[in-house]
Regions:
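Small beta-barrel nucleic-acid-binding modules, primarily SNase/OB-fold domains
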Residues: 1-135
Length: 135
């Protein structure tokens, strides 16, 4: 089950994709929005929908790290058909390389999305970490 753009739930265990950050669907009662021209769009929902579509009915396999995040979620990288969901999200512009934690692991995918104005890079947005800091 997809919780949001960077978190899934498998057998009641929440797994946060480490090293990336997706827009917030709901954070402290607030939704994160992006703007395409005058149109106001829920960028958190866009990321979640993209992830749902990428997983489809396929089996998800995750490599779980030993540590958890501050919300007690497991951290890891998850795959569909041996393809990293984190890399897919970042390369298509629906999540961001989170340099604070990733050591720029996804920077090539992010540059590709940015250069090609894919996903959120085609809109005005606030990075999720800035949105949380400001709210």
């Amino acid at each position: 089950m997809v919780v949001d753009g960077d978190t899934i739930k498998i057998d009641s265990v929440k797994i946060r994709f480490s090293g990336i950050d997706a827009p917030e669907s709901y954070y402290k009662g607030k939704e994160q929005f992006c703007f395409k021209g005058e149109e106001k769009i829920s960028c958190g929902k866009l990321s979640k929908i993209f992830l749902i579509e990428k997983i489809g009915n396929e089996k998800v396999k995750c490599e779980i790290e030993a540590k958890t995040d501050r919300y007690k979620r497991k951290l890891g990288e998850c795959f569909v058909k041996d393809k990293s969901l984190s890399r897919i999200l970042v390369k298509n512009g629906y999540a961001f390389d989170y340099p604070r934690y990733s050591k720029k692991k996804y920077s090539i995918e992010q540059e590709y999305a940015k250069k090609n104005s894919l996903g959120l890079w085609s809109m005005k947005f606030e990075f999720p970490w800035d949105f949380r800091k400001n709210n």
